[in-house]
């Protein structure tokens, strides 16, 4: 009875409340740091985490600068905590080779956040395991040289709009932010190639497609919500998935409806009436496709080895086969949406960086202009294969640009099973982050890494280059699928521009460029130059 009396809330309410508060605070304190011993147990050095949020404040300047600092302080193997999630950062080429190639079967998937929403959740970027392999097999054959040639006229049409826009700045002689011009241009290309829609972004900024693109890329998660998601993922991630998000739903709904309407129209048309674009190429592969095995998935290796000749069609030796599960409409929509993300952000940033480097390195630009003039005499209407073979110095300039400023400067792989990588124990579920930027700026592999030097990428220099020290588009079976299309667009764009103009630095040109590193690496304040008629 005395015990019951002691527990009676009427007699001891304040004491019970205080005891519960103490227990709750103790549990909260334990929870706030309980996840932060795993890196130490693995013997991986890392910055000291803060309760709940881990090392979130370490990245307040951006991932680019923080990766450089991690490499400087802790070497090519380090780690950090993103909220409660452990991330292992690698920039050692031998370890990267193991993860991306030799032990790829254990590192097939990218990191899943649980926050992916349709339609991008159905893209090749986020598909996992067997379904990723099936869809990748289908899409690999969509990027053959023969099919890429069909896209060249669509890209050239958008180039004509860009050139007309640049002509005005050439006539005025004023300094301007060419990154904004490239934003409009890549929007036009994406609309035409992936969505079957013609737009002129610079003249029609309020066009629904253009407006929804702006809204999509302006979207960001409020800082408080991000902190809560990272601190309490088991509660906040499911909650974030079910709570309505009007802006996100409107943007996703617009692109979803647009693509589905185009698909419905194409299905009603005869084959010869259908527009030949990327969307149609994917639609043609919905039910059967050339059988392309995982060993043929490394599109990046094929793209960068093609300087010796036009790359072979990866689908050529294989016969069409029925898919175990045909591409769903959702998956077709997902690939088009991914094209928007990569085709806008990556291409815009790469064009901006190469323009800046040419403007601030006039000797390199002069050498490139001579090559462009010689090439144009031989190929007045260039196609994919001629662009691959005929512009070796442009290839060198682009390669060095992508070394200095890799737009996709980090990417992840997730361990499916416990394993060891060069003696380092990696538990199942561990996320490995490849720090491409830190790798590309490591003086051990790239002497004087801050200097723009296209001669690093002569044929002889590339033969001597250590494998897996240059990864602008990843490597291995899960490397960037659209690399050949991306390079085609960049080369074709620069070819069209440099036939008519040259880039010049001016007082408004920011040297060195300040960088912004959120989802991709980009110039923080644009790229201001002058453009001069030739």
Swiss-Prot record:
UniProt record, GO biological process: icosanoid metabolic process; prostaglandin biosynthetic process
Instruction: Show the stretches that span the lipid bilayer.
Output: 11-31, 76-96, 224-244, 337-357
Q: Which regions of this chain are Lumenal-facing, per the record's topological domains?
A: 32-75, 245-336
Where does the source fall among the domains of life?
Eukaryota
GO molecular function annotation: 12-hydroxyheptadecatrienoic acid synthase activity; heme binding; hydroperoxy icosatetraenoate dehydratase activity; iron ion binding; monooxygenase activity; oxidoreductase activity, acting on paired donors, with incorporation or reduction of molecular oxygen; thromboxane-A synthase activity
Enumerate the UniProt keywords alphabetically. Endoplasmic reticulum, Fatty acid biosynthesis, Fatty acid metabolism, Heme, Iron, Isomerase, Lipid biosynthesis, Lipid metabolism, Lyase, Membrane, Metal-binding, Monooxygenase, Oxidoreductase, Prostaglandin biosynthesis, Prostaglandin metabolism, Transmembrane, Transmembrane helix
Q: Which InterPro entries match?
A: Cyt_P450, Cyt_P450_CS, Cyt_P450_E_grp-I, Cyt_P450_sf, Cytochrome_P450_3A
> Where does this one sit in the cell?
Endoplasmic reticulum membrane
Q: Which residues bind heme?
A: 480
Which co-factor is required?
heme
Q: In which tissues is it expressed?
A: Expressed in lung, kidney and thymus.
Topology with respect to the bilayer: Multi-pass membrane protein
Q: Which residues lie on this side of the membrane: Cytoplasmic?
A: 1-10, 97-223, 358-534
E.C. numbers:
5.3.99.5, 4.2.1.152
* Predominant place of localization: endoplasmic reticulum
Provide the catalytic activity annotation. Answer: prostaglandin H2 = thromboxane A2; prostaglandin H2 = (12S)-hydroxy-(5Z,8E,10E)-heptadecatrienoate + malonaldehyde; a hydroperoxyeicosatetraenoate = an oxoeicosatetraenoate + H2O; (15S)-hydroperoxy-(5Z,8Z,11Z,13E)-eicosatetraenoate = 15-oxo-(5Z,8Z,11Z,13E)-eicosatetraenoate + H2O
Complex and partners? Monomer.
Family, per entry: Belongs to the cytochrome P450 family.
What job does the chain carry out? Catalyzes the conversion of prostaglandin H2 (PGH2) to thromboxane A2 (TXA2), a potent inducer of blood vessel constriction and platelet aggregation. Also cleaves PGH2 to 12-hydroxy-heptadecatrienoicacid (12-HHT) and malondialdehyde, which is known to act as a mediator of DNA damage. 12-HHT and malondialdehyde are formed stoichiometrically in the same amounts as TXA2. Additionally, displays dehydratase activity, toward (15S)-hydroperoxy-(5Z,8Z,11Z,13E)-eicosatetraenoate (15(S)-HPETE) producing 15-KETE and 15-HETE.
> Any idea what this protein is called?
Thromboxane-A synthase
Write down the species. Sus scrofa
Q: Cite the source lineage.
A: Eukaryota, Metazoa, Chordata, Craniata, Vertebrata
